[in-house]
Amino acid sequence: MSLSQQSISIIKATVPVLQVHGVNITTTFYRNMFKANPQLLNIFNHSNQREGKQQNALANTVLQAAIHIDKLNELNLAPIVHKHVALGVLPEHYPIVGTNLLGAIKEVLQDAATDEILGAWGEAYGVIAQAFIDAEAALYKVTEEQIGGWRDTREFIVDRKVEESSNIISFYFKPADGKPIATYIPGQYITIKVPLTLENGEQRTHIRHYSLSDTPSEQYYRISVKKEDALKKSDPNGVVSNHLHANVKVGDKVLLSPPAGDYVVDQLSSNPILLVSGGVGITPLLSMAKATLAKQPEREVTFVHSSKNKQYQPFANELSQLEKSNKVKVSTVHSETDGQITKDKLEKFINPSQIKDTKVFICGPVSFMSAINKQLIELGYPKENISYEIFGPLTNV
């Protein structure tokens, strides 16, 4: 199914309007959709809604769709498709989203949202929604039919809790049914669903993605969770992470969705790898480093990690083991004593002759990734060779 040329022209003409009113439209969209369909609150991240992150992310997605409406095949749907499958998004959710999105456009733009504009966007949404539905159906099928695979959630038991630093704990999960578990590509995440009671007594399912932090195993999954400081009831950032730290114990059961995500190392490539992480952003990169050492011991890996100080430095022993292998070059920076990672410091860690061929993976706070990304580009790393993972709604760095 393709869009008519008339609809393409109309949507292109709405780009300036979306640049001005996009966030207002998506904010209105979420408000109206949740009011009419409160069950969807069990799919979306409440903190991201409260902080406006999800609204901004959706506004950017809609804007990019409008800009590329004549070349939708150029849009990278994979990150969103993986998120949707991890969250359990189904085909029947798309008409709900479409109805509320068009309604929000009309509510915000009022008379400027003519029948012609709404018709064009309705047609476009149908095409885009079908592209997502088809891609998600294919991913659901592959995920479910692989060895040890499953669909939706599966019950796991907390086998171990290990303190990695003063604010990070690793959780080891084994399947409650004792059956095989699906493997994963280093860099992927699993999704945990936690029922929590809100202040008003209402119970909601909170869903969070956590990077898998170990090399793939046939016996367990490992995630490593940071405890958030100064949690307030009025501002419940880290509500799931802090719940895991405080209340989830060895022997408890949890519900997990299968591994997902497209932020992964190409294990068929021999290109050098540069890993740069900040704080708990180390988790997917540690998995990449350990798996590469195990499967491609001759592949060059440089790992640069920044943490506040030794107290907050996670996985010190595992980083030491990587370094002792003489196959992975490890550098740690403690910002309290060493300062932030700078372009000059990065130059000391890297091999200048490999810059053009190196695949780079960055993970950490958005401000950290933005700074590192800028420094790497200034050093000559091709933009297309730099990948980053954001713990939250998709955005640019």
Swiss-Prot record:
Active site: 94 (charge relay system), 136 (charge relay system)
Subcellular localization, as worded in the UniProt entry: Cytoplasm
PROSITE patterns the record matches: FAD_FR, GLOBIN
Annotated Pfam families: FAD_binding_6 (PF00970), Globin (PF00042), NAD_binding_1 (PF00175)
EC number(s) on file: 1.14.12.17
Induction, per UniProt: By submerged conditions, in growing cells.
Primary residence: cytoplasm
CDD domains linked to this entry: flavohem_like_fad_nad_binding (cd06184), Yhb1-globin-like (cd14777)
Transmembrane residue ranges: none
Residues the entry annotates as binding heme b: 84
Keywords in alphabetical order: Cytoplasm, Detoxification, FAD, Flavoprotein, Heme, Iron, Metal-binding, NAD, NADP, Oxidoreductase, Oxygen transport, Transport
Entry's Gene Ontology molecular function annotations: FAD binding; heme binding; metal ion binding; nitric oxide dioxygenase NAD(P)H activity; oxygen binding; oxygen carrier activity
GO BP: cellular response to glucose stimulus; cellular response to nitrosative stress; nitric oxide catabolic process; response to toxic substance
Ranges where the Globin domain occurs: 2-137
Site annotation Involved in heme-bound ligand stabilization and O-O bond activation: residues: 30
UniProt domain FAD-binding FR-type: residue ranges: 151-266
Cofactor binding, per record: Binds 1 FAD per subunit.
Site (Influences the redox potential of the prosthetic heme and FAD groups): 83, 389
UniProt comment concerning the protein's domains: Consists of two distinct domains; a N-terminal heme-containing oxygen-binding domain and a C-terminal reductase domain with binding sites for FAD and NAD(P)H.
Function: Is involved in NO detoxification in an aerobic process, termed nitric oxide dioxygenase (NOD) reaction that utilizes O(2) and NAD(P)H to convert NO to nitrate, which protects the cell from various noxious nitrogen compounds. Therefore, plays a central role in the inducible response to nitrosative stress.
Protein name: Flavohemoprotein A
Organism whose genome encodes this protein: Dictyostelium discoideum (Social amoeba)
Gene name per UniProt: fhbA
